[in-house]
Amino acid sequence: SKNLKAIAVRGKRQIHVADRQLMSEISKEFSAIVMENPLTRGLYENGTAAAVLGNSAAGILPTKNFHYGEFDRAESISAEAMNEKILVAREGCYACPVRCKRAVKSERYSVEPRFGGPEYETLASFGSLCLIDDIEVIAKANQMCNEYTLDTISTGMTIAFAMECFEANILTKEDTDGIELVFGNKEALLATIEKIAKREGFGNVLAEGSKRASEIIGRGSERFVLTVKGQELPMHDPRGKYSVGLAYALSEKGADHMVAAHDTMIASKDQFSFKEIMPLGILEPEKPTKFSPLKVRTFAYLSMWWSFFNAAGICDFVPVPRSSMSIDDVINALNAFTGWKTSVFEVMKVGERALALARIFNAREGFDAKDDIVPERLHGPLKNGALKGSFLPKEDFMQALQLYYGMMGWTENGIPTKEKLLELGLEWLVEG
């Protein structure tokens, strides 16, 4: 009723640091190794956009609403294209040496650097997913979403859903306010974003997101919806990275690519990222396209590690395996900052506790194992690229979910047991 979308709070007091000298030493050490490590160096040079060409070559770049894994014009929306045509600055969060943020400018589409620049997810969701090959159009779409406070993944996925409906004659120009909503139509993309933001005409339907929009449209459109728990898929195809399928299904808030490390980060003993994550008890790599007890155990450990990041407010692009800050340095930094004497064991339990608490919250709202699924399209084959014919095997996937539940101390229905809650110090949930 108040039309309130958000409350922004900006603190003015300085944050207390328990051991400022030690914290400064750790920060200097990390800053020094950032440019020596290829993972963080790559983030500085090309940002997350570096994933565009690699994922397309690997056959896992979502293309045409996840029908394909390779985009034949990926070069046009790549980091290299951005660097050459529209990049004006490399920026970052306060005091961060990685500086993975892009600032771009385009005279043709009035794109301003103050809105930053498109990340990988945006390049894919407005690019390959919708068959758009114009980096400046994608930058404009990104700016519009930032200005209107729209999520670029869900917006791109919802528009791709509508484009597939249009292609299948479920939607016509009469439905879309005269917009020729076909894959590859650049102006249609921008016009639709505007309509979604202002809830004008057909935009009022798409503003609900693809799942609810499909319920309004009907006519078989539900088969083009790619969501988990109502949230659209990010731009990583689980048919080439099986753990990502588990991440999508298990995330308490719906499909999320930032729940745990992706399979390709730890697929070989020779990888820096694999070597550095071994102290967590991950001693053997596993093929990205394979389900096994080893794969599930690795995912369980890494989901706890990632969950701890969220609890502590640590950027996923700083610690291993995604970047170069070692496990010891993460723990030492946390202790220096807080004055605690914590350990790897304790922070892993913090992550596990947060995961269990989220499951209990969702269970209260009616979510359980029936909701830990991925769209049927992912259980079908990719239609092109290096992984043509690959699919996420449904039976193996469901067995992996059950194994994960067991490893986490959850029931077959995905609910933490009384014993697990007590072990995690969440007895108040049992008593309640």
Q: Over which residues does each language-model region extend?
A:
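Extended C-terminal regions of large enzymes
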Residues: S1-G432
